[in-house]
């Protein structure tokens, strides 16, 4: 959050220079970081929920930043409303945890979790509610529809929301609750299925997009599906590992896209771009590194995290050859 977020702030200083709402933009951006840190550093589900709602509000403000643009306002409202559906699931999960354990503090909940047998109804219910929350925030089927429209915000916002912070909050929440999810085979299988289907669907949609930012948006949805699938097959650590590596190369790709758009006077259609390497060599090489990383080229971070996910999808405690096959296909589609 702080590492990639700081780099995006530095980039945004130059990118937003001369914009009429310069100070408003950085107010929203820093408020977003504040709530994201609360979400990550809190020691209870209560604090996580405060941060969770805060980043939802800030994403609405940032996506709809261009107040004179109707499509931006509509995209902001769409993101806010769809996320409220997921938030309802999350808060129901928190209530279920509270009534089951008498506390929402992580340590107290996880210490008492072993008292319940595997497949206990209350644990399964809480985990399925958490999955609904994660589907909203991390853009999983069927609540993924808000993420591509979130491209209406300034490019640094796209980088921050899609790479470093907000959309990975759902994956973080599932991984943080791994003690509970591990006690519910139904929830684990559900998580893996939702993640696998999202990864496959988003990767196929990305293939037919012309808008450079929408390609990256659907690519993000696909990679989030990868992370969720990793958690579903029992590879929580590997899912978080891919979350971290993805934050860096996806932020790089979004900032590279912003650089290209800036040079081409906000042109988004990739078919109208060509020979940009000649005029923007630095952007070309950095973008190429980002593409190679997300494609899983050996030697780069994406290769190691994806390789581990595929291994667990095949041989993990909740793994299945179908998950491995979907993961392999999605890796190929992403590389293409």
Q: What are these language model-derived features?
A:
Residues 2-51, 57-336:
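Hydrophobic transmembrane alpha-helices and their helix-loop junctions in integral membrane proteins
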């Amino acid at each position: 959050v702080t590492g990639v977020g700081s780099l995006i702030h530095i980039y945004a200083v130059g990118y937003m220079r001369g914009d009429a709402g310069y100070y408003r933009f950085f107010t929203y951006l820093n408020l977003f970081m504040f709530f994201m840190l609360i979400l990550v550093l809190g020691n209870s589900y209560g604090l996580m929920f405060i941060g969770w709602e805060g980043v939802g509000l800030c994403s609405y403000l940032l996506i709809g930043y261009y107040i004179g643009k109707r499509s931006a306002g509509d995209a902001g409202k769409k993101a806010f409303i769809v996320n409220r559906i997921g938030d309802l699931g999350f808060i129901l999960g928190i209530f279920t945890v509270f009534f089951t354990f008498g506390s929402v503090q992580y340590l107290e909940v996880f210490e008492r979790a072993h008292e319940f047998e595997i497949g206990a109804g209350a644990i399964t219910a809480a985990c399925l509610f958490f999955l609904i929350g994660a589907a909203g925030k991390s853009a999983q089927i069927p609540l993924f529809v808000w993420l591509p429209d979130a491209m209406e915000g300034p490019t640094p916002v796209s980088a921050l929301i899609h790479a470093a912070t907000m959309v990975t909050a759902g994956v973080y929440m599932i991984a943080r609750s791994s003690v509970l999810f591990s006690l519910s085979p139904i929830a684990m299988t559900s998580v893996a299925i939702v993640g696998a289907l999202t990864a496959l669907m988003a990767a196929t949609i990305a293939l037919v997009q012309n808008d450079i930012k929408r390609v990256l948006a659907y690519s993000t949805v696909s990679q989030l599906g990868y992370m969720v699938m990793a958690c579903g097959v029992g590879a929580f650590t590997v899912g978080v590992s891919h979350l971290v590596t993805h934050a860096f190369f996806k932020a790089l790709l979004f900032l590279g896209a912003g650089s290209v758009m800036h040079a081409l006077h906000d042109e988004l259609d990739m078919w109208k771009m060509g020979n940009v390497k000649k005029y923007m060599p630095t952007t070309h090489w950095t973008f190429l590194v980002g593409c190679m990383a997300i494609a899983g080229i050996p030697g780069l971070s994406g290769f190691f995290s994806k390789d581990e996910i595929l291994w667990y999808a095949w041989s993990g405690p909740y793994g299945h050859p179908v998950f491995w096959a979907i993961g392999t296909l999605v890796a190929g589609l992403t590389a293409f």
